[in-house]
Amino acid sequence: MEFFKKTALAALVMGFSGAALALPNITILATGGTIAGGGDSATKSNYTVGKVGVENLVNAVPQLKDIANVKGEQVVNIGSQDMNDNVWLTLAKKINTDCDKTDGFVITHGTDTMEETAYFLDLTVKCDKPVVMVGAMRPSTSMSADGPFNLYNAVVTAADKASANRGVLVVMNDTVLDGRDVTKTNTTDVATFKSVNYGPLGYIHNGKIDYQRTPARKHTSDTPFDVSKLNELPKVGIVYNYANASDLPAKALVDAGYDGIVSAGVGNGNLYKSVFDTLATAAKTGTAVVRSSRVPTGATTQDAEVDDAKYGFVASGTLNPQKARVLLQLALTQTKDPQQIQQIFNQY
């Protein structure tokens, strides 16, 4: 009888031990940026990006082992000012291919173009596991480096099943933001990332996420964008508008054979006359033209001062110019018809 009691007790203890060890598996895909940067001084802001590899990033946060089984992979190690279509396609394909091998993904990334990568992945990832992007505003050698705790919170988010089916997420400064709406709003502030039109999805406190809302637009598996067979993306450039603007940048993009042009307009996406005329001509000859705005909040609406249908233009809605460029690149893999492109902008 005593033998059976001891056996049962041992089985119970082993069961509890197994449950404690059953942590989620999280894959960290590292791309570089300030979070992987290093400098010569703990108190000065000068540093070099991409000096720290993914293994050192993970080892700098030993608390990660308490919340997940973490595996790191170095995709690239660059400043995000050098982010490009090839890395975007690599990330999307890798996540889609490895979706069944892990419980969630964390992507470490520079903050300069994080919002663009987040939106691209939000449109192209076909995985129902959490995908979380994270970075830092201060290098790893800074006295008050924000990267380690941001990384911890990102893994917390990726390990939480409640983070699934919310699109690609950005976690910075205790805040969870959605990949479509998030933007960088300050050059140096650690609280730089905000969803300026709709607010955050949630907040993180003491390792727990309090979700407030879900993304309103379609994302990930609910989009038609399949990059599995793509090796390059359509060429799309951005033209900036201002008082007495030159039309030379717009003409240069047209002459270079760009497939699409996004106008960073004034006000409600308005254009200086010479730029307007150049883009109207371009639209008639098959170049996709999207009107966005340099104004940080609000929407660029259809048919306000500009008759979009008449000129073959597309209104970007709440997408800023850099995000409108991302969606136009993907839209052009589906169609060149401006009316159909407008429908895509209305949905995603």
From Swiss-Prot:
Taxonomic superkingdom: Bacteria
PROSITE patterns in the cross-refs: ASN_GLN_ASE_1 (PS00144), ASN_GLN_ASE_2 (PS00917), ASN_GLN_ASE_3 (PS51732)
Catalytic activity, as annotated: L-asparagine + H2O = L-aspartate + NH4(+)
Residue ranges of every copy of the Asparaginase/glutaminase domain listed in the record: 24-348
Subcellular location: Periplasm
Disulfide-linked positions: C99-C127
EC id: 3.5.1.1
Effect noted on mutating T34A: Loss of enzyme activity
A GO molecular-function annotation: identical protein binding
Keyword Disulfide bond attributed: yes
Keywords of the record: Disulfide bond, Hydrolase, Periplasm, Pharmaceutical, Signal
Main subcellular localisation: periplasm
Induction: By cAMP and anaerobiosis.
Database matches in Pfam families: Asparaginase, Asparaginase_C
An annotated GO BP: protein homotetramerization
Keyword Metal-binding: no
Entry-linked CDD domains: L-asparaginase_like
Gene3D superfamilies the UniProt entry points to: 3.40.50.40, L-asparaginase, N-terminal domain (3.40.50.1170)
Catalytic residues identified in the record: T34
Top EC class of this enzyme: hydrolase
Note: E.coli contains two L-asparaginase isoenzymes: L-asparaginase I, a low-affinity enzyme located in the cytoplasm, and L-asparaginase II, a high-affinity secreted enzyme.
Family: Belongs to the asparaginase 1 family.
The name this protein goes by in its record: L-asparaginase 2
